[in-house]
């Protein structure tokens, strides 16, 4: 249900 967008953002941080 959660889009893997926030996950990519974390990795980007």
Curated annotation (Swiss-Prot):
Its EC number is 3.2.1.117. The keyword Protein transport does not apply. It catalyses: (R)-amygdalin + H2O = (R)-prunasin + D-glucose. It is an enzyme of class 3 (hydrolase). Keywords: Glycoprotein, Glycosidase, Hydrolase. GO terms for molecular function: amygdalin beta-glucosidase activity. Glycosylated. Monomer. This is Amygdalin beta-glucosidase II'.
